[in-house]
Amino acid sequence: GHSWGPKRADLANDPTYGGNTDNAFTQKMGKRQGQYYVPQRAEAGLDPWATPQAYDNAKDFFDTGITWSNSLNVAQMLDKSSYSISLGNTHQDGIISSTGMDRYNVKVSADTKLTNNWSSGFTANYITTSIDKAVTSGNGLLRTVYAAPPSYDLAGIPSHVDGNPYTQNSFRGSFDNAYWAMENNKFTEDTNRFFGNVYASYQTDFGTTNHKLNAKYMVGVDAYTTHYVDSYGYGSNTGGGRGQIENYGWTNATYNSLLTINYDWHINEDWGLNAVVGNEIIQSNRKKYYEYGTNYNFPGWNHINNATTQQTEEETWKNRTVGFFGNVSASYRNMLYLTLTGRQDYVSNMPRNNRSFFYPSISAGFILTELDALKNNIVNHAKLRVSYAEVGQAGDFLENYYSTPTYGGGFYTLTPIMYPMKGTTAYTPYYTIFDPKLKPQNTRSYEVGADVNFLDNLITFSYTYSRQNVKDQIFEVPLASSTGASKLLTNGGKIHTNTHEFTLGFNPIRTKNINWDFAFNWTKIDNYVDELAPGVENISLGGYVTPQVRASAGEKFPVIYGVGFKRDANGNRLVDENGLPIAGEAQVIGKVSPDFLMGFNTTLRLWKCTISAVLDWKQGGQMYSRTTGLADYYGVSKRTENRDGTIIFDGYKTDGTKNDIAITGANAQQVYYSRLNDIDESSVYDNSFIKLREVAVNYKILQKRSIELSVNAFARNILIWAQLPDLDPEASQGNNNMAGAFEDYSMPQTASFGFGFNIKF
């Protein structure tokens, strides 16, 4: 049930559970003055009678997170060589007791000069990370924390029934009790990563001062393995009550070979020329595995071998890219600059007829203050710049009819015949069809800008405008089940982006012991979906059936799609005969892209002390907050505290007149918020906020030739002013396309306070 029941002070007089009234419980156990019966306490084997009081379930649930970071770096310069060794460790205890992280890293690098012309070196890094996570959306921990009424002692009442740790005891039975889930549901992520390179270089000036040649060959590797375990214990609401486990992960190894030859020619006092040619080979080997199991044979062992039903998948990819590139840069009197580049790529992950593509760029710069006529004491630097660039991008193409062992049936999503049957295994086509005419995606960028500094850099100004046009965008188009597949990987999308970026900086105090600078940056980014594939008006990027985040043709990218308010021809929200808002059709109910982003940063150095601060401002844009909407629906938000008040919804009646129908009665708010829960648009909020991102202080205690000692302290995310109620707008979740647009019982953002010290000797 919801928390819309009687007031806490009236619980003892509740006709069903009150200890002051005649009901089934007092008839059996006698009256308990001033108390009320709590069924969950009885299930846990406790005294079922409790005195009404308020509990701060969220405060009781969350801990204070702690992060420890330690690092040691040893470096030495020798006559013709140098080396460094770095060791690091980070340990983090999360704000939920079952979460945390441990990371260890080591880095070794060395360089040596073999002869006057030859040198060599290497860099090697190894990182191991282990993370204990908490699931949020879906059957997440916070659903029972935020939705529990303040009269319920979530932390004090055991999360399982007396004598059976695998039968939950919860206020909201459709979701796992948060404390039970911390003990029985485990989500882990373990990653081991190695990356590094080795190089050899040759350089010469040919015995002159005007010519320099540098040739460098480098080979590198970036290999990692990430293993995930998502397990719901026996008794969880996920997995039908008998548990569920998913083991999955990736092994990825990318090998890189890079050869560059750089030639620099100082032609004369006016002209300079630089040319670079090179070759790059990238080989990527990926392997994905997936194991799914459900219905544990017995409780207490969350393991795939304990599952009665198991499913496994394995996929491998191999991609190779061979690229040839070059650029030529010319300069005139350190005033005019022109650069031309080009790259030809040959890829293996495209259809055979479309495996090569060329993308060029051109850029120019003009430093006006190098002209004698413009040299002055007011404008000490002024530069104009312009550029055009193309970037090609291949897709992940496979030959059609790549098959995986599964079941056969006649329809993609229906399985009337189950295999293997009598020892015969069936196969079905891969669920994605790949367009045999797939072309590389192409992005064309245009940019103009200016940089101007005044009064010996007392004031600095920069402005950039850029436009990106993406054509032949590669994306997956959903298909009907009758096609035998679920997706088609093809070209078709066109997106363009307009970006304005403005930076203004000041450095009013510049002395030996005191320096103060501050800067503002303003950015406006507008992404537009011009078109998708023929016949496709929108594509889901994540979410539920409704609401969800979409890319929609003719709209800004992305948009929120869901059930909206029903409106009249003038856009006014309509109400029914009871004064309740009417649910309309599924439609675009929010636009995610902000109007602008603005940042402010400042640094003040006072002798040995440095103080800095960062402030961010996001204006406009919208996001969907399921947490806020359900808090209203359950009656646990501050907005629902006026239980005796009446509500007149701001809308219009179907006859076109302003709504004046009052929603009244003891359960008026419950009825009202229950209706809003059916309308996704009611949970779409303005995403504007201003946040004091960081304040930091550093003080040098000791600074001598052989040793340096400093201490530092910081505070992050300490103040926020936001339109979204209850939550930090940056507590959204999802992939990159959904980030900032969708929130469903997300982990709260945290304020962080820390200190540290550095020793150099």
Q: What are the functions of these language-model segments?
A:
Residues 19, 24, 31, 43-46, ...:
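Extracytoplasmic gating/loop element in the C-terminal half of outer-membrane beta-barrel translocons
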Residues 591-626:
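Glycine-rich, aromatic-lined ligand/substrate-binding cores of catalytic
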Residues 519, 529, 563, 584, ...:
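Conserved SET/PR-domain catalytic core that frames the SAM/AdoMet-binding pocket
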